[in-house]
Amino acid sequence: WLFAERIGALIHRIGERRALTIEYIGLIFVFVAYGLVDDATTAAVLYVIDHMFFAMAIAISTYFQKIADPKDMASTAGVSFTISHIAAIVIPAALGLVWMWSTSLVFFIGAGFAVLSLLAAQLIPFDPGPGQETVLPLGRDQVAAAGP
């Protein structure tokens, strides 16, 4: 919350795609470093950096607000919350089992998730809006218009 206003201004200035790209690249490095660190001071510094990058995740919400139809906001947000909640239960449970075998591997898997998120962020257009939800050549409306 300490940097929320500045992060919001940064997202407004550089856009959601660039903000999420910065976040995920940073998280890749942080998670790999977590997997390699062996002293508490470095881990504490990484923890602070980790939370600073996670604060940029607000860009996902601003992206959603730009592309979503206002009448679909509540239902879509509900589905998104449910999916996130399921992931927040299943992934830590599975990684808890991995932790018993290798603590470093847990963080390398986290870096892998950040790589996947980075790739997904590249699908966000630089100026998102209704009808411009993705950089892919065929959006939802074009696919429906093209027919089977």
Feature locations, PLM:
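Transmembrane alpha-helix termini and helix-breaking/packing motifs in multi-pass membrane transporters
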Residues: V90-V106
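Loop-to-transmembrane helix entry/capping segments in MFS-fold secondary transporters
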Residues: P70-S80
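Structural signature of the two symmetry-related core transmembrane helices
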Residues: R18-A33, A111-G112
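Hydrophobic core of transmembrane alpha-helices in multi-pass small-molecule transporters
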Residues: T41-A55
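Intracellular juxtamembrane helix-capping segments at the cytosolic ends
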Residues: A55-A68
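Helix-to-loop junctions at the C-terminal end of transmembrane segments
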Residues: F3-E16, W99
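Transmembrane alpha-helical cores of Major Facilitator Superfamily
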Residues: I25, V48, G78-I86
